[in-house]
Amino acid sequence: MPTLQTLRRKVKTIQNITHIVHSMETLSMVKIRALQDRSLRLKPYTEELNNILMELVKRLSNEYLNHPLVKERVVYKTGVLVFTSDLGFCGSYNLQIIETLKKFIGNKKSQNLVFYSVGSYAQRYLSSNNFNIRKKYIKFLEDTSFSNAKLLARDLLDDFLNYYIDELFVIYFDFINIAKQEVRIKKLLPLIPISLEEKKEEFFLFLPSLSEILDPLLMDIFETQIHQIMLDSAASEQAFRRFAMKRAHENAQKIYSKLLFQLNQLRQNQITRELLDITSSIEAMKEEVK
């Protein structure tokens, strides 16, 4: 049976843990609100850009349907961008990403895969399994600004345009709301694969020239997609962390209540024993006086 001192120490420890996990839960909630607002405000813009691109590409001539960011090519190397966290305490967030990644790899020839890992968990998994990691981005999601998204987008575009990879997929968590996040596998490059049968043989006069419109538009669409994915991933991670910390806080409170009950019970028993000793001593003294 634990001593009174041991129980007091345990109660103090659990009390400290309760304060810590509650603080982490509160911090995650603050971060979620900020990221959620940015993510949900960006989504309509991202969707509208995609609608514009789809409409524009349908109207392009053969010359511009061969744009390197639009045209499908023979696939020799497949790029895979994987978003995980750098920190723990986020429940099954990383586990679900890694499980999805394993299934994706199982459907591909691993020797033809090139990986871009965001977060230390993806990097550790890929390194331990000797996969080809092209670039590692550690603590990258600490900055979810558009300028940081552009840096990642340029790295990926450089490899695609220089034929280091022939297509690009991303595995990440799509942030739907604070209670729902889903793992997605999405093809990012080529941007819009359209077969020759699907195109419209129509010609338009573009002012300024079509190349001046198309190049920056395609670049903006890809950079915006990367930014959206970064925001969704960061918001989803915090949502998982908040839920994990909430469960940890609830469990810590249950343990605290249980230990406090044991402590009070032990103290009560100790006081009872002391009272019995005192009573017995008084009775003994009375007997001696007689």
UniProtKB/Swiss-Prot annotation:
Keyword Cell membrane part of the UniProt annotation: yes
Membrane topology: Peripheral membrane protein
Signal peptide (UniProt feature, chain positions): none
Single GO cellular component term: proton-transporting ATP synthase complex
Location of this chain's protein in the cell: Cell inner membrane
SUPFAM superfamilies hit by this protein: ATP synthase (F1-ATPase), gamma subunit
UniProt KW keywords: ATP synthesis, Cell inner membrane, Cell membrane, CF(1), Hydrogen ion transport, Ion transport, Membrane, Transport
GO molecular function: ATP binding; proton-transporting ATP synthase activity, rotational mechanism
Pfam families reported for this sequence: ATP-synt
BP term (GO), one: proton motive force-driven plasma membrane ATP synthesis
Keyword Membrane among record annotations: yes
Role this protein plays: Produces ATP from ADP in the presence of a proton gradient across the membrane. The gamma chain is believed to be important in regulating ATPase activity and the flow of protons through the CF(0) complex.
Family that this chain belongs to: Belongs to the ATPase gamma chain family.
Summary of subunit composition and partner proteins: F-type ATPases have 2 components, CF(1) - the catalytic core - and CF(0) - the membrane proton channel. CF(1) has five subunits: alpha(3), beta(3), gamma(1), delta(1), epsilon(1). CF(0) has three main subunits: a, b and c.
Name of the featured protein: ATP synthase gamma chain
Species for this entry: Dictyoglomus thermophilum (strain ATCC 35947 / DSM 3960 / H-6-12)
Gene designation: atpG
